[in-house]
Amino acid sequence: MRTDSGVWLTVVAHMIVGVDEAGRGPLAGPVVAAAVLLCEGGIAGLDDSKKLSARRRGALESAIRAQCRWGIGEASVEEIDRINILQATFLAMTRAVEALGFEPAEVLVDGNRLPRWRYQARAIVGGDALHPCISAASILAKQHRDRLMIAAAQDYPAFGWESNMGYGTAQHLAALRRHGPTPHHRTSFAPVAQLQLV
């Protein structure tokens, strides 16, 4: 494998990839997954993205992108509504792993459910706080999705997506009742679906 600013693990048996997602619960926006193969030696300070400040996440994201092999996958709002959020999450995870450009020896996934993959995989509850490769994936997934929602907020400022990232906060729900759903909303999610029945 190619060497850049980090030294890639070249032994197939060591190609253990971490996968995590961001955005299963929001009412708006895609679900995003990231897959990360850490460079040899790892990156100091990795942790569950939810436990890190925005500034720290940003610094770690830069290090991960520069020093690790990584892939990002998304499943759109349309895919979420068509196949459900769990299957859309698995689809995003699959796309993230495929974006790596190689077949890993094993994939460690945060959570208790796994996609149907041809390669070996393990679901690990709380894995984003236990395994650095999953921690790195959680950081990339959150940072990537946050940027998507901040960009979408420019077209729909009333919903406050630049701060709530599509989650059902009081501001978001009030704007949803006032303005109705946007193309970014998940119509299969109850708060949005109920408005469409009124």
From Swiss-Prot:
Required cofactor names: Mn(2+); Mg(2+)
UniProt KW keywords: Cytoplasm, Endonuclease, Hydrolase, Manganese, Metal-binding, Nuclease
Classification via SUPFAM superfamilies: Ribonuclease H-like
GO cellular component, one term: cytoplasm
Record has Heme as a keyword: no
EC number(s) recorded for this UniProt protein: 3.1.26.4
Residues involved in a divalent metal cation binding: D20, E21, D110
Listed GO biological process terms: DNA replication, removal of RNA primer; mismatch repair
PROSITE patterns: RNASE_H_2
Comment on bound cofactor: Manganese or magnesium. Binds 1 divalent metal ion per monomer in the absence of substrate. May bind a second metal ion after substrate binding.
Keyword Plastid tagged: no
Occurrences of domain RNase H type-2 (ranges): 14-198
Entry superkingdom: Bacteria
Gene Ontology MF term list: manganese ion binding; RNA binding; RNA-DNA hybrid ribonuclease activity
Cross-referenced InterPro entries: RNase_HII, RNase_HII/HIII, RNase_HII/HIII_dom, RNaseH-like_sf, RNaseH_sf
Cell compartments where the protein resides: Cytoplasm
Entries under CDD domains matching the protein: RNase_HII_bacteria_HII_like
Substrates-to-products reaction catalysed: Endonucleolytic cleavage to 5'-phosphomonoester
Listed Gene3D superfamilies: Ribonuclease H-like superfamily/Ribonuclease H (3.30.420.10)
Family the UniProt entry places it in: Belongs to the RNase HII family.
Function as written in the Swiss-Prot or TrEMBL entry: Endonuclease that specifically degrades the RNA of RNA-DNA hybrids.
Protein name, as recorded: Ribonuclease HII
Taxonomic classification: Bacteria, Pseudomonadati, Pseudomonadota, Alphaproteobacteria, Sphingomonadales
Protein's gene: rnhB
